[in-house]
């Protein structure tokens, strides 16, 4: 059984995207993502320095766009049994599992990053990594100082978060046997200090159309697999102000019988945690395109052959529905709204729904074949109305 994972904030390093621009289609995907994110992700991923990409409002869109671009080069989430993301990486995992489109993921991460940055600026807060020590002792010390265990990543890796003054007191009175390392982040993410960001993200999420995952999709709140797109979206919103339990995600991977893990770029953090928590499980940190062949080999070796739901097999067909009411417009220069048999790549635009306030794009979360259009260019459509039937395909 194979799982694809997407890392969270802090994994980015200067220039990590540069080699990926040589892969056909990646620059175009990143260019489109940049428009949705409102910033030049190609520049931030290639020539920007560490301070620039540390900015929460930049780092979060950069991470999601990078993971999705690499997934597209790998042929998408169709080649996995399960998906999981750490913190903001959950948005990329949702796309791989077919819950939402890449465009909607970029719209959400733009709001998420900006809202979390604004919440962090409201009060002087921060985060400190706690390495080693007895877990119960560490958690008791964190609570004693009024802090929150914002990330419990694995045995011996917990991140405390809260007010700067409380973190200073914690540093002066550390748990026995533990080492403390202050993190260079803007604020106390995944704590109550992020409540304003939850409200902003909830408003943005109300505009997103979701479908149920066709992969086993793990969530950070408790490591559990979600079965509906609605539940996943609710969890994604709440997670901004709730601790990340990656340790429980790792436990679920073990319970599921995961035999291989591929981490999307900027890779290394999650495979490092898995190496200690899941000994014997094959891991590949996909850092450069040179590793794509090895990743495909790992997929071929470990992909489950089960025919049950949630085992990574593509659904027979899916409906793409209107995200809002308005007028449907087919994409100029690609194929008209009556065409069938057209093959579209992961995240390719299928058209737009135009409203008085703007337009919403349609995209498929999978590489797919157009089976049947249910509307024509210029038709009025209602929110939730089926627009097109598609057959997900591998390797489009």
Which ranges hold each PLM region?
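Acidic, low-complexity mobile loops and tails
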Residues: 307-361, 367
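Alpha/beta catalytic cores of group-transfer enzymes, especially the acyltransferase/condensing modules
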Residues: 9-11, 37-39, 49, 96-241
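Exposed loop and linker-edge segments at protein-protein interfaces
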Residues: 337, 374-375
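Non-catalytic positions within long, well-ordered alpha-helices that form the structural scaffold/packing
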Residues: 75, 251-257
């Amino acid at each position: 059984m194979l799982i694809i994972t997407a890392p969270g904030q802090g994994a980015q390093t200067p220039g990590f995207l540069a080699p990926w621009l040589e892969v056909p289609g990646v620059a175009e995907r990143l260019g489109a993502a940049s428009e949705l994110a409102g910033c030049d992700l190609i520049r931030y991923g290639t020539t920007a320095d560490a301070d620039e990409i540390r900015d929460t409002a930049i780092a979060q869109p950069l991470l999601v766009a990078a993971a999705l671009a690499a997934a597209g080069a790998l042929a998408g989430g169709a080649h996995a049994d399960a998906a999981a993301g750490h913190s903001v990486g959950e948005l990329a995992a949702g796309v791989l599992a077919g819950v939402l489109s890449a465009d909607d993921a970029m719209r959400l991460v733009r709001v998420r990053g900006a809202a979390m940055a604004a919440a962090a600026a409201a009060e002087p807060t921060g985060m400190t990594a706690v390495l080693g020590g007895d877990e119960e002792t560490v958690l008791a010390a964190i609570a004693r100082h009024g802090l929150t265990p914002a990330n419990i990543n694995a045995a011996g890796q917990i991140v405390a978060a809260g007010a700067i003054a409380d973190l200073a007191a914690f540093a002066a009175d550390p748990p026995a046997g533990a080492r403390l390392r202050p993190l260079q982040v803007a604020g106390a993410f995944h704590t109550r200090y992020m409540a304003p960001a939850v409200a902003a993200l909830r408003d943005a999420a109300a505009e997103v159309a979701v479908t149920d995952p066709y992969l086993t999709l793990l969530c950070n709140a408790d490591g559990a697999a979600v079965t509906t797109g609605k539940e996943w979206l609710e969890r994604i919103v709440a997670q901004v102000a709730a601790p990340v339990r990656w340790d429980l995600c790792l436990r679920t991977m073990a319970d599921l019988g995961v035999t291989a893990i591929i981490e999307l770029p900027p890779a290394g953090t999650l495979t490092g945690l898995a190496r200690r928590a899941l000994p014997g499980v094959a891991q590949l940190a996909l850092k450069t395109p040179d590793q794509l062949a090895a990743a495909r080999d790992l997929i071929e070796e470990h992909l489950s052959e089960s025919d049950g739901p949630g085992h990574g097999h593509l659904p027979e067909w899916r409906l793409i529905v209107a995200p809002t009411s308005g007028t449907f417009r087919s994409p100029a220069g690609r194929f008209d709204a009556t065409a069938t048999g057209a093959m579209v790549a992961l995240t390719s635009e299928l058209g737009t729904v135009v409203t008085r306030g703007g337009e919403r794009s349609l995209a498929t979360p999978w590489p797919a074949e157009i089976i049947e259009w249910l509307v024509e260019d210029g038709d009025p459509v209602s929110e939730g109305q089926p627009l097109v039937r598609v057959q997900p395909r591998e390797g489009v």
